[in-house]
Amino acid sequence: MKNYKWQEWDINHFKTLYPQLQADTTKELIHNRMGRLYWVWKDDALYVQRFARENGPYQGRNLKWLRKCLPNARTIVDVGMNVANNTMEYATWAETVHGFEPTPSTFALAEANVELNQHVELKGRYYNSQKVMSEHDPDHADGWYKFPDKTFASLTMSADVHLHNVGLGDVAGSFQMEDHPNNVGHNCILTEERKQKTKYEVYDVTVNTLDSYNFENVDAIKVDCEGYEYPILKGALQTIQRCRPVVQLEIVEAQCKKFGYTPQDMFDLFHKQVGNYVTTDFQGNDIGTDWQRIKGVMDRFFVPKEIYQKIPKDNSKVRHPGMERPQINEEIFEELFE
């Protein structure tokens, strides 16, 4: 694929580069206000709500805190990559990024998204919120991470990116997952009980342990796997002990319950088993060693003390345009997984 300069940005042309996806009526190519491009499922409205139009990167507040923790990240591992939305942003500042996604159809979109965005230069803003339409203004500086001098960090994907079409867990093997056609972010490995109840299509996936890859210089691990976070951590324990990365986990209590553990088990892994970690929210606040619900916050960051102590503290709540999100009622959210 040729490299496209910012003057050549044309979403209609980019669609033609992937004729199979373009012909698939269940897929569409969308973009956010910074020009980042995503092949997604057309019937999954959450993708447009989270990724497109006036939005910056999904969960930009988490990205900003992770980059603040690790301004010179060497290797970042993205577990539960989905369509590579986070993988692509990690690639703007890390040296190496590994993305893991077990669902074949999702993995295919992630591959296309990484390939396309690696070849497209971005400059300015690509969406006019006042006109509610796509419009490129190359002179309107934009991005999701600001340096102290108020300039935006580059959106160029400069990292060496490796994508893996497998799942991760505490043991290697073949597992079954269920496919949520209108919300693929909820695809998950099935417990024995769930296998008897699921109404969704079931498919087999290969699962390895993260430790089996023997990755070096792992500075960050992000895990968002619909309740399977703790088994993944257990299969990554040697890597965590050896590399002492910042670990970002999505934690929903009801999802943990499905797999027979509690959020506190993950807190104890870092604070009692590994040791010398600080648990924070996306603003860097130390939230202690015990699990507690925080309204509107689903991710927790486990940060090595030697890293946390060096981070300049700034608890500003100012957000860039498009990053505002309605507060999530986590109790209602969790009821969906009972």
Regions found by a protein language model. Name each.
Residues 54-75, 144-147, 176, 190-243, ...:
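Short internal loop-to-helix segment that lines adenine-nucleotide cofactor pockets
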Residues 173-182:
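Polar, low-complexity loop segments and adjacent catalytic/binding residues used for recognizing
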Residues 263-276:
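Conserved Class I S-adenosyl-L-methionine
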Residues 244-251:
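Conserved beta-strand signature within the Rossmann-like core of class I S-adenosyl-L-methionine
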Residues 1-158, 195-200, 215, 278-338:
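S-adenosyl-L-methionine
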Residues 90, 236-244, 270-273:
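Short, conserved loop/helix-junction motifs that constitute active-site signature segments
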Residues 167-170, 209:
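Conserved acidic residues
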